[in-house]
Design a protein with these regions (language model features):
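Catalytic-loop region of hydrolases
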Residues: 18-85
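N-terminal cap/lid subdomain of alpha/beta-hydrolase-fold enzymes
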Residues: 57-163, 449
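A catalytic-pocket lid/entrance helix-loop region that shapes and gates access to the active site
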Residues: 107-111, 208, 212-307
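Alpha/beta-hydrolase active-site loop
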Residues: 132, 142, 162-182
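Alpha/beta-hydrolase fold nucleophile elbow
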Residues: 187-199
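Short alpha-helix in the alpha/beta-hydrolase fold that links the catalytic acid
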Residues: 206, 426, 440-450
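Alpha/beta-hydrolase fold catalytic core
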Residues: 293-438
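Catalytic histidine-centered segment of alpha/beta-hydrolase-like enzymes
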Residues: 467-478
Length: 502
C-alpha cells in the first residue's frame, strides 16, 4: 500500500490559469519499490509545485517537478545529503520534462519495443536500468511547460514574459529555483549534476556558470543529451556557413547506412567502422571545398560530389545542384524518394513517412514526433495522476507557449568553459544518437571541441554515441548502455578526498 502525504505549504496562494486554480507551493509524496540491475530499490516520489521568487520575495511563477529519492534501511549508514543528485531538463524551448522522465532515467518508463518504437496500448513499465540506484533525480518543467505557470500579482497581472522566455532569462530564474530546491531538500553537501536534452543542452551549459557565479553552487558534472548548440543552429540570414553545413554529412552517412542506401562495400561493415572515414572526409576535404564557394574548380567540385554521394546515398547531380551544401530537410525528403517513395524523420531518421506527393523539397510532417506525442502524452498524464497521485485540472503542456524566445547574447558555450576553468572538479558528458537529424552527433562533437580551444581541459570531456535518434535512450539496448554510461560518469566525477586545485 502506497503511503501518501499531502502537504500544502501555502494554502492561500494560488496559481490561476483559465479559471483553474492549483496551489503554488505543494508537495505530494508516494512510496514505491522497484528492481534496478537486479537489486530491490525502495524510493519516495515527490511531485509538487515550487515557486520562483522575485528580488522582493514575491512568487512570480511556480514550477512543477518530480523528485525521486532512494530510501535506505536504518541499519545502513547512508547519508542522504552525501548522495549524488541530478537535476533534469528537457528542451524545446517550451518542452516539458516528460521525455527523459518516462523515457530515460526515471524508475518508470513508457512501454516501447526493443528498437524504441512505442507500442499500443500505451502505458508504463518498470525501468530496470534507471540511475536511481546511484543518484537521486529531479525532473523540472520550466515556466509554461508541464503544469508550470506564471503567477499573477495581487492585481491579477502576470509578470513580464521577458523574465522567463529567453536564453539568459531562462538560465537566471532556473538557477534561483534550483538554489531554493537544494536548500529546502538539504542537499548542499550532495555531489550535484545537471542534465539537459536538446535545447536543455544550451540551458545546462549556461546554468553551470550561473549556478557557480550567482548562486555559489558548484557542480560535479554537466550532461548534454543530443545538445542543441545555437551557435550552429541559428543564422541571421538563414544560411549556414561552410563548417555548420558540412557537419551534417556524418549523420547523413549513418542514416543512409541504416536504410541500406549505400554500396555493398559499405553496408558490409559495421557503422562504427564506417563513420570515422566520413568524419575525416568532412573535416579535411568537404569543409575546405564548401568554403571556396563559387570559386571551387569544376574538377574539385566533381570529386567532392562523388565522395559525398558515396557516403550519403544521394545522387551526385543532386549534390552538385545544391552546390555541395545539402540542407537537412532536403536530405529527409530525398534519401528514399526514388527507391521507396518515402520520407525519413527529423528527430529520429529511422522513422519513415508518407507525403502527399513525392515531389517537393521537404517532408510534410515530422513523422517521429507524431508517434512520440500520441504515446508519451497519455502516459505522463495517467502516470502523474494515478501513480504519483498529483491531481489537477490544469493541462499538462507537452509543448508550451514560450515564444517569442529571446536568443540574443548566447554565451553559453563560452560560459561552460569559464565554469570548468573556475571549477577543477567539473566534468562534461555528451550523449548523442547517430540517427538524430535535428541536433546531430557530429555537431555535438564539434561543440565539445570548441568549448575549450586551448585543449587544456579536454581530459574532462566525454562523448558517447548510440544507434538511435534524438531520444537515443528509447532503443532498449541504448537505454541500458546510456544509463550505465551515466553511472560510470558519476563514478568518475567523484571528488571525495581531493583538493579543488590545478
Amino acid at each position: 500500500m502506497k503511503k501518501i502525504l499531502l502537504i500544502f505549504l501555502l494554502n492561500t496562494s494560488m496559481i490561476f490559469s483559465q479559471n483553474i486554480h492549483v496551489p503554488i507551493d505543494t508537495i505530494v509524496k508516494t512510496n514505491h519499490e522497484t528492481i534496478i540491475k537486479g537489486e530491490k530499490i525502495k524510493y519516495t516520489a515527490e511531485t509538487g509545485m515550487q515557486p520562483v521568487w522575485d528580488k522582493d520575495g514575491n512568487p512570480i511563477a511556480s514550477l512543477f517537478y518530480t523528485y525521486y529519492k532512494r530510501n535506505f534501511s536504518k541499519d545502513l549508514d547512508k547519508k542522504e545529503s552525501h548522495r549524488p543528485i541530478i537535476i533534469s531538463f528537457n528542451g524545446g524551448p517550451g518542452s516539458g520534462s516528460l521525455w527523459m522522465h518516462i523515457g530515460y532515467t526515471g524508475p518508470r518508463v513508457l512501454k516501447i519495443d526493443d528498437e524504441g518504437f512505442p507500442i499500443q496500448p500505451y502505458g508504463m513499465k518498470t525501468n530496470p536500468y534507471s540511475i536511481l540506484d546511484t543518484a537521486d533525480i529531479v525532473f523540472v518543467c520550466p515556466v509554461n511547460t508541464g503544469y508550470s505557470r506564471m503567477i499573477p500579482d495581487k492585481n491579477g497581472d502576470l509578470p513580464d514574459r521577458k523574465k522567463f522566455f529567453g536564453i539568459n532569462a531562462d538560465i537566471k530564474y532556473l538557477a534561483t529555483w534550483i538554489n531554493t530546491f537544494i536548500t529546502r531538500k538539504n542537499r548542499w553537501e550532495s555531489p550535484k549534476y545537471i542534465i539537459g536534452e536538446s535545447y536543455g543542452g544550451t540551458r545546462v551549459m549556461g546554468l553551470s556558470h550561473e549556478l557557480q557565479n550567482s548562486q555559489w553552487m558548484y557542480l560535479n558534472g554537466v550532461i548534454l543529451v543530443s545538445p542543441a548548440d545555437y551557435k550552429l543552429l541559428e543564422f541571421d540570414d538563414g544560411q549556414e556557413d561552410a563548417i555548420d553545413s558540412s557537419l551534417h554529412l556524418p549523420y547523413y552517412a549513418a542514416t543512409a547506412w541504416y536504410h541500406k542506401m549505400l554500396d555493398k562495400e559499405i553496408q558490409s561493415i559495421d557503422l562504427l567502422e564506417f563513420l570515422p572515414k566520413v568524419e575525416e572526409f568532412t573535416i579535411n576535404e568537404l569543409i575546405p571545398a564548401i568554403a571556396k564557394g563559387g570559386f571551387i574548380s569544376d574538377i574539385e567540385r566533381n570529386e567532392i560530389a562523388e565522395k559525398y554521394s558515396y557516403y550519403s546515398g544521394l545522387d551526385k547531380d543532386f549534390i552538385i545542384d545544391y552546390n555541395l551544401d545539402i540542407p537537412n530537410y532536403a536530405f529527409w525528403k530525398e534519401l528514399l524518394r526514388k527507391r521507396d517513395g518515402l520520407t525519413i524523420g527529423r528527430l529520429d531518421s529511422r522513422y519513415r513517412g508518407i507525403d502527399r506527393t513525392n515531389a517537393g523539397s521537404r517532408p510534410d510532417t515530422n513523422i517521429e514526433l507524431n508517434s512520440w506525442n500520441h504515446s508519451f502524452t497519455p502516459a505522463i498524464n495517467h502516470y502523474v495522476r494515478n501513480e504519483l497521485k498529483f491531481e489537477t485540472d490544469i493541462k499538462y503542456n507537452v509543448f508550451g507557449p514560450v515564444h517569442p524566445w529571446n536568443k540574443e547574447n548566447d554565451n553559453t558555450r563560452k560560459n561552460l568553459r569559464k565554469a570548468m576553468a573556475q571549477n577543477p572538479f567539473l566534468k562534461v558528458f555528451i550523449q548523442s544518437g547517430y540517427y538524430d537529424g535535428a541536433t546531430n552527433y557530429f555537431q555535438a562533437k564539434y561543440t565539445m571541441w570548441q568549448v575549450d580551444p586551448s585543449g587544456k581541459m579536454k581530459d574532462r570531456f566525454y562523448f558517447e554515441g548510440y544507434r538511435s535518434g534524438h531520444m537515443m535512450y528509447l532503443r532498449n539496448e541504448d537505454l541500458k548502455k546510456s544509463n550505465d554510461d551515466l553511472r560510470e560518469f558519476i563514478k568518475n566525477s567523484s571528488t571525495n578526498g581531493m583538493p579543488a586545485k590545478y
